[in-house]
């Protein structure tokens, strides 16, 4: 009897061993990049899995036999593979091709985890490395480049700031590898020019209100993703030199640029090191006249130093360190002269401006990141420590009593702990949960260079736990839902306001601690079954302490004394975004579309009160739509187009009134054609942009002038040209022309009269001739 029992136990263990085989694998695209979020099935069974952030999957406890493994996902061509299971685990690595680059593109910003665009129920624009490489041959101004490529984003101002630029009519949060660059406590509009384009691998733009990264993303997020190491070589590099200048009047307009990059992987180490130096010349308009130096891109010295090193501890663990230094300073030999809004532009004449030089003396960014793909079963961990130290100086102005330059300093220290757990309950319910906590200390102030305190030091401490669920329901419905709890403590010292413009100043304000608590939500649903029609609907909220510094510096004297807690309106803004949209892929044709509504009970518009720009906290409603389309006519010929419309109103004393031009931009349309007439030798790109008109306001009867942001905007069109000739795989010569047909125009913000001194023409035709050598 004992022998029978022993034999039975042995047979049972043997059977269990036979029934416990696993299929392990990894799925990559044609560039060997991991593809997350793909669904893996064994036909005829209930076995299923989802690839994790690194493209890995495991099908557990598969009985011996022959099966068909199916890998599928939005934006990729389905792969079917015959597999046979015997007595051992097997490994099956696959490569999948994209059926639509737009849907298959991997994004990390939207959900703080690697996922494809086709699995995100919101509007996303990605500017790829190829686009950046091509269009930076026309202009290295990232501000202008984004305006030409992102529907819903205001066209660039042709200056060193993004004043008046919005994403879907609201402020946006700018980041570098997730490190916030924006200064929402005192918005200086210098966050877009915070890094050189040479070290950006791609740009991810998440549209619509979101709180996933905290304060300031009422219109969305723009995240600059920095370059990664070359994993195929121990040592590689690229040298890029170029010269640029005006085609309307070359005198004093010539500039130069040199950039050097080294990269490679040595055993478990990988590295990227880069340095860039650029000197721009004088900018001229279409008639050859010198453009006014006010916040100009002309005569700027730009320096960028970048380094990133990584170490793979083992197959699951990695540590990575990044640092970037950016500096841009203007060495102007011209000063502003003349000009009258609506009649003649402000121009540049030889002279020396009093006060300090304008520009950004430094912007330091660094992070230390630890990642573990499997901290415990089905769960990955990312821990990120980051730091930013930013200092920028504005132009000299007699706006301040006795004259002076104001500056903004911002010091940020942060910690992010992010976990992701995948789950596979059944073929009809699987997905992942991302959760963690953000800790941020942001210290921002706006002094004058001479030491006077224009805006006092604001010391914000932010603690925010969050959770984000992504689940496939009945295979084809993708549900995303999440929440974030903002716990903010803002300390402001006692201060006395200074005189500027028509504001008398001299108001003593009692400081204090301002606490904020807010719970924000998001939810979205996407139907992923059909490539030709992939619709989504979503709701999301953002949390913002918009430009609190501007409010503080305008404190009014009241009975009993002014205080940050009592007499100054410092309420936070909660913005709600409602959106419905779709993506489509039919053979060589692809398209996207979205309609959105954005509301807030408190506004962020500026109004002119006695010559002083003052925040107006009125309820707002913004709505708009966006469309994109592309067609691959030939392997070497593609065409893409986009169109965006946005409009908004706020509550006024006599009903609804339109939002100013500093918030709402005219309609924008683009048409891009890329053609390679000589295979692997010659590339040509033609990029057209149309900016429409917006004339919503009348002259102020009291001043017989246009209020700030109320100027009538007329339409204009611009065409840019890119050409590149590849002598071989290592050497390329490029020629880019900005404003090819030398259009004579005023940028949108100049026409809107966003500021009294911004009636400045856009640049005339400019060339950029460069040589790139890779080794």
Model-derived regions: residue spans:
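A beta-strand signature from Gram-negative outer-membrane beta-barrel systems
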Residues: 197-238, 774
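Short, acidic, small-residue-rich periplasmic hinge/interaction motif at the N-terminus
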Residues: 28, 33, 39-43, 72-76, ...
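Gram-negative outer-membrane beta-barrel transporters
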Residues: 240, 440, 475, 595-600, ...
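Face-selective signature of the C-terminal outer-membrane beta-barrel domain
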Residues: 3, 312-327, 359-503, 510-511, ...
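Membrane-embedded beta-barrel scaffold of Gram-negative outer-membrane proteins
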Residues: 378-398, 526-528, 534-544, 550-553, ...
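Short acidic/polar hinge/loop motifs at secondary-structure boundaries
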Residues: 60, 144, 179-207, 260
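Extracytoplasmic beta-strand/coil segments of soluble accessory domains associated
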Residues: 143-183, 201
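Transmembrane beta-barrel wall of Gram-negative outer-membrane proteins
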Residues: 251-280, 289-333, 362, 425, ...
